[in-house]
């Protein structure tokens, strides 16, 4: 049956509701609220366990649960705070806070602010975030950001950034590499291990840490005083790459500007009509460029270097 609350309910037992209409408060540290066919919440809900098993629950105020389980649809402009639980459905809220071990195999969308200090995992899971932060761990298929997002924890996911993303933690591992598409501003101050990085035209990827990627497609600006190791890819005519240290391990087409301010190492084939600027470095592969400038010392061992002009 439907559960309608317009007053104040303290529940430390179990409420099974076909649908919920709550305009006031439902509290109880040990209580369980189970909703089988959605409803509306314009009040406050604070329970030990909240489970939504069917229908659509529209939450325009707040739900706080030690364990929050959803296999249906949560919509609205409210706030959701959970410590543990699982989501296999769709959750859309203005604000989402996760404080513990949470399994997401569905989709969680946070339109205003997302905060994770716990461990979010789940195959097939998708996080869509406007503004937010992660100080815990995120292991998901996809993380999409559109506002300001900071990571001080660990992330394993394919990341699409349309806002301002700052990484002060770790993204990807050798066993679980990330795929990053930057359509905004991306700053890495620590570690990124990626299978692929795409930096869009007129967008900026600043690396002051360490980036290792199997392949990169750079149509914008990749700058900073960090180190990058590239397994292959392309720097287009609109692309600019400037790093302290650059290592090329796979075939790479440079048609833009690429500068290594400290050290440069190439063991593959670099092709294209771009400009390559090197301080100190070594080449055991093949380099063909429009222009090569060496400010320090370049050691060529068993490789070939060809350019329209070479300045030393």
Model-inferred region functions:
Residues 1-312:
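Extracellular beta-strand-rich, repetitive "passenger/adhesive" scaffolds
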